[in-house]
């Protein structure tokens, strides 16, 4: 197959305005192509979200490609140089919402699978795709429920490649072999509302909160490790008061987030926060939300297969990294021992005029195909 096979498919996907959670039949298009080469396709839908599980083969090892057909909203369309849902070739790039995140990865893997199956129709092991329309949104009815279903069935995943756009300066320079965890908190500090001229008759929760926050932001939570940077604590929102300048507020709210490494656990972080707040004598309510645990795939069969494929195709020695935000890899890592993320350059993801370099489509497809060969055909 030629590079145009990937280009044609990604154009067809971009033309479908699949803003979370609407799939707009992207997965139906993928299933039709996959069924033609022997994949058994199943739709798992819940809460307005569409998920596709497609598998070819019954033996081990099972190599999975995971991705999402949903995209973020395009934002003001008048800021785009072309319609975000009309795929447009211009100056060596393909423009459109989802071009980089992550419809090109999906198209490249589907074509890679077609080429691989055509060359090796009796290949050992199994290939599967796990595609959701709920990655950019709440992510509660997407990959996580498919993983739960696969666990209940006893399906054993061995390797998973998540097609997130991980490259930075050039295709293949960075892969993600892990991600930090995310832990958020909503802290409500209770005070006593009153007149600013009579502070002795009030209790200002902002004044009480400020020194506690100052201490929290100065803490070194851990030192990280060889795979992860140190855990970070960031305050994202502060709110107090009525808008009037002569009223002491009755309560103050702070929202904060940890991005944490495997050097700390959620329970350890929570305990240290509570210790600080209690020591400062605050009357408070603290609600926690664990967005995801950190995961890590040490060097092994999957990292070697992908890094080797990248080097063979591009000449680059890919860096293994754990930086960045969370992804659906956090759900897959619960049922799959080796998970890695790899895809095109991410400089324009979620931005106006999102784009991918046209010349990267064929190499991306070839890297995915070579990785399948390295994993499934190795002696």
UniProtKB/Swiss-Prot annotation:
Could you name the active-site residues?
70, 135
**What is one Gene Ontology biological process annotated in the Swiss-Prot or TrEMBL record?**
L-arginine biosynthetic process
State the source organism's domain of life. Bacteria
List the CDD domains hit by this protein, alphabetically. M20_DapE_proteobac
Q: Which cofactor does it need?
A: Zn(2+); Co(2+)
Question: Which pathway does the record list?
Answer: Amino-acid biosynthesis; L-lysine biosynthesis via DAP pathway; LL-2,6-diaminopimelate from (S)-tetrahydrodipicolinate (succinylase route): step 3/3
- Where, in this chain's numbering, is Zn(2+) 1 bound? 68, 101, 164
Q: What class of enzyme is it?
A: hydrolase
- Which keywords belong to this entry? Amino-acid biosynthesis, Cobalt, Diaminopimelate biosynthesis, Hydrolase, Lysine biosynthesis, Metal-binding, Zinc
E.C. number, please? 3.5.1.18
Cofactor detail note: Binds 2 Zn(2+) or Co(2+) ions per subunit.
Catalyzed reaction equations: N-succinyl-(2S,6S)-2,6-diaminopimelate + H2O = (2S,6S)-2,6-diaminopimelate + succinate
Q: Name one GO molecular function term.
A: zinc ion binding
Recorded hits in SUPFAM superfamilies, A to Z, give: Bacterial exopeptidase dimerisation domain (SSF55031), Zn-dependent exopeptidases (SSF53187)
Give the residues the record marks as binding Zn(2+) 2: 101, 136, 350
On assembly, the entry states: Homodimer.
Q: Which family does it belong to?
A: Belongs to the peptidase M20A family. DapE subfamily.
> What's its job?
Catalyzes the hydrolysis of N-succinyl-L,L-diaminopimelic acid (SDAP), forming succinate and LL-2,6-diaminopimelate (DAP), an intermediate involved in the bacterial biosynthesis of lysine and meso-diaminopimelic acid, an essential component of bacterial cell walls.
UniProt cross-references to PANTHER family, sorted A to Z: ACETYLORNITHINE DEACETYLASE (PTHR43808), N-ACETYL-L-CITRULLINE DEACETYLASE (PTHR43808:SF31)
| Family matches, as HAMAP family | DapE
Protein's UniProt name: Succinyl-diaminopimelate desuccinylase
Species per Swiss-Prot/TrEMBL record: Bordetella parapertussis (strain 12822 / ATCC BAA-587 / NCTC 13253)
């Amino acid at each position: 197959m030629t590079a145009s096979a990937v280009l044609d498919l990604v154009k067809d996907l971009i033309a479908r305005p699949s803003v979370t959670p609407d799939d707009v039949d992207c997965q139906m298009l993928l299933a039709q192509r996959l069924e033609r080469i022997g994949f058994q396709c199943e739709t798992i839908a819940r809460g307005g979200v569409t998920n596709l599980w497609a598998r070819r083969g019954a033996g081990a090892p099972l190599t999975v490609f995971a991705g999402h057909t949903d995209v973020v909203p395009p934002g003001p369309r008048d800021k785009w140089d072309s319609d975000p849902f009309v795929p447009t070739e211009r100056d060596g790039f393909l423009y459109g919402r989802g071009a980089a995140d992550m419809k090109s990865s999906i198209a490249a893997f589907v074509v890679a699978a077609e080429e691989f199956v055509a060359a090796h129709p009796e290949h050992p092991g199994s290939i599967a795709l796990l595609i959701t329309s709920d990655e950019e949104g709440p992510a509660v009815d997407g990959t996580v429920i498919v993983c739960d279903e696969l666990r209940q069935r006893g399906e054993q995943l061995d390797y998973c490649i998540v097609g997130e756009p991980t490259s930075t300066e050039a295709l293949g320079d960075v892969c993600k072999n892990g991600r930090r965890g995310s832990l958020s908190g909503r802290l409500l500090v209770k005070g006593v509302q009153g007149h600013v001229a009579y502070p002795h008759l009030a209790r200002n929760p902002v004044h009480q909160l400020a020194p506690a926050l100052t201490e929290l932001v100065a803490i070194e939570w851990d030192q990280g490790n060889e795979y992860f940077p140190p855990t970070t604590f960031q305050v994202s929102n502060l709110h107090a008061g009525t808008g009037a300048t002569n009223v002491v507020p009755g309560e103050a709210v702070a929202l904060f987030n940890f991005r944490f490494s495997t050097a700390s656990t959620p329970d350890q972080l929570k305990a240290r926060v509570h210790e600080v707040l209690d020591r400062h004598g605050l009357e408070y309510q603290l609600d926690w939300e664990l967005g995801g645990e950190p995961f890590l795939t040490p060097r092994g069969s999957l990292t070697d297969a992908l890094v080797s494929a990248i080097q063979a195709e591009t000449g680059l020695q890919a860096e293994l990294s754990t930086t960045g935000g969370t992804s659906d890899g956090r759900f897959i890592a619960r049922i799959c021992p080796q998970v890695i993320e790899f895809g095109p350059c991410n400089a324009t993801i979620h931005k106006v005029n999102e784009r991918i370099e046209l010349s990267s489509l064929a190499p991306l497809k070839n890297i995915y195909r070579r990785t399948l060969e390295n994993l499934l055909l190795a002696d």
